[in-house]
Amino acid sequence: MRMEYSEEAIKELYIQYWKCMISKDEAGLRNLMSDDYYLMHMTGTRQSADEFISGLLDGTFNYYSAVHDDIQVSVNGNTATMVGKSKVLAAVYGGGKNRWRLRGDFTLKKENENWKLTSSKASTY
């Protein structure tokens, strides 16, 4: 598989990730994540996929829109890293809607010829 194809597939995965977050699509998110996926929030809290998706579904995390400024991908065989930068309209932890400049540092691995998110770390830019 050409490197460019993998990079484009991973960029599309990032876009799909945000679409699933906005629509609260549990099945879609799980399809994008490895079984051992975890998210590290800006606060330093680490959550498993189950914990994070539960918070998404119960309204702890609400995402309304995402405009992607930049997506950088580096592929190394069957693993990859990605940095996505997006302006996100969100309301989290009971707060009001705010626009955030969110940076996600992701790790990925290839499972059965499909790229899966293995971790993400949230920060701002």
Residue ranges and their predicted role:
Residues R2-S23, A27-N31, D36-Y125:
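A beta-strand edge to alpha-helix "cap/lid" segment located at domain peripheries
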